Amino acid sequence: MAFNGKFNFNRICVLDTETTDKYWNSSAPVQIAAVICDRKGNILDSFNERIKTNHAISPDASAVHGIYARDLIHCRTEKEVLSDFCIWLMNNEIDCILTYNGEAFDRPMLNMRCKTLGIQTDYFDKTKFVGIDGYYDCIKDAKTVNYKGLRDALGRKWKLTLVAEHLGINSSGAHDAMVDILMLKDIFWMVDPVIHPSRWATEDKPTSLF
């Protein structure tokens, strides 16, 4: 379901994957990482696991995330990890998923893989479960208003590491899925309440929680 512009969530899953290829409809995950955050961005739980995939990992993908087939020999299978990940999401009673460009890549890729593997879940179906895209629903608007000089510094560039570095957030180890979601978490909770204060308003607190 599309994000309706109100941040009325209490258990947010910040999610990222590393994959075998750059196209969502031909990729499979080689790493899934996620943290569950409360409304203020405090981490409540985490999940991080590499996956022994049956897909060939493209050289271009390995050049980005540094994961090769030899690194996954002793990892669990994709169906095992994805099944446990979906159970973990359910047990954490999440009410939305936050990604960075993940509405166009991570969620449809995971939705396709779950269907292929016979895993019943709605978490990755954009028509059934709410997702927030950290770029299109946050950073793009921040650049429009030139928050902290983002537009001047980055122009049309959008990579998570560039945004993090400009905002003074550590990007060491980028392209490991867990490192990337921690960057995204820090960026989102720094930027979104400032540029979208009405999203964060509550009945008892008419202004931002921050």
Regions found by a protein language model. Give the residues of each.
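Metal-dependent phosphoesterase signature
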Residues: 64-84
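Short acidic, Gly/Ser-rich segments with clustered Asp/Glu that frequently serve as metal-coordination loops
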Residues: 17-25
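Metal-dependent phosphoesterase core characteristic of DEDDh/y 3'-5' exonuclease domains
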Residues: 3, 10-11, 25-67, 91-210
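Short, well-structured alpha-helical segments in soluble
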Residues: 83-91
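Short, hydrophobic/glycine-enriched beta-strand segments
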Residues: 12-16
